[in-house]
């Protein structure tokens, strides 16, 4: 009889205990405040735009990658890959301050002009001279013949007619017609004599 009395006492105790309601329809709305339900639906278009705008900038992502110990492959190029020996904009080095000399500047140096005239005036069957240079820069055959008949140096006449061109363009003609001797003279003048002349005359910069 004792086990039966114990079982009845257990039933009475269970009847007094509150029974948990497991019906989902009877869940209290207050539960969502304590345990928010995760929204698993796809975001709408407006939400996508908001998410995109709220994304951290690339700099933050880069810093995050560096903090994690991984190099950033999309960052700026390494210094070794960048161009070497290139001057920046508004550079104040001596090479950038000097303007490119023109043939007009070359004509003011009588010593240099005499050397070029001696090298380009003579006519040789296998050596390119002033005629080839002048023809390349658009001088007609009649003009070439006319300059040959004049007592003045034809090389000087050719240079006077192209005085607005740069000395660099003249050196390109020397390379084109394999006149390395003339190019060497011009190169030495540009590298050594021209900087002295340009710095010695400040009025050229104004």
UniProtKB/Swiss-Prot annotation:
The record ties this protein, via InterPro entries, to: DEATH-like_dom_sf, Death_dom, EDARADD
Q: Name one GO cellular component term.
A: cytoplasm
Q: Which UniProt keywords apply?
A: Cytoplasm, Developmental protein, Differentiation
Top-rank taxon: Eukaryota
The record's section on Pfam families has:
Death
Q: Where in the cell is it found?
A: Cytoplasm
Feature: compositional bias, Polar residues: 24-33, 52-62
Renumbered residue ranges of the record's region Disordered: 1-36, 52-77
In terms of Gene3D superfamilies, this protein maps to: Death Domain, Fas
One record GO biological process: cell differentiation
Q: Domain named Death: which ranges?
A: 114-190
Q: Is this entry keyworded GTP-binding?
A: no
Q: What does this protein do?
A: Adapter protein that interacts with EDAR DEATH domain and couples the receptor to EDA signaling pathway during morphogenesis of ectodermal organs. Mediates the activation of NF-kappa-B.
What does the annotation say about its assembly with partners?
Self-associates and binds to EDAR, TRAF1, TRAF2 and TRAF3.
What is the name listed in the Swiss-Prot or TrEMBL entry for this protein?
A: Ectodysplasin-A receptor-associated adapter protein
């Amino acid at each position: 009889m004792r086990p039966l009395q114990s079982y009845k006492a257990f039933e009475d105790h269970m009847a007094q205990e509150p029974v948990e309601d497991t019906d989902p329809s009877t869940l209290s709305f207050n539960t969502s405040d304590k345990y928010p339900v995760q929204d698993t639906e796809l975001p709408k278009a407006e939400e996508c735009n908001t998410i995109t705008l709220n994304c951290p900038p690339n700099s933050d992502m880069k810093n995050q990658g560096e903090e994690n110990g991984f190099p950033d492959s999309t960052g700026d190029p390494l210094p070794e890959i960048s161009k070497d020996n290139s001057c920046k904009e508004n550079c104040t080095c001596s090479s950038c301050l000097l303007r490119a000399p023109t043939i007009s500047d070359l004509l003011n140096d009588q010593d240099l002009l005499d050397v070029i005239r001696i090298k380009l005036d003579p006519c040789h069957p296998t050596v390119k001279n002033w005629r080839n240079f002048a023809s390349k820069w658009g001088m007609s055959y009649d003009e070439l013949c006319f300059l040959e008949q004049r007592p003045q140096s034809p090389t000087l006449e050719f240079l006077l007619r192209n005085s607005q061109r740069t000395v660099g363009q003249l050196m390109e003609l020397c390379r084109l017609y394999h006149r390395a001797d003339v190019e060497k003279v011009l190169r030495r003048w540009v590298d050594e004599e021209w900087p002295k002349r340009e710095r010695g005359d400040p009025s050229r910069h104004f």
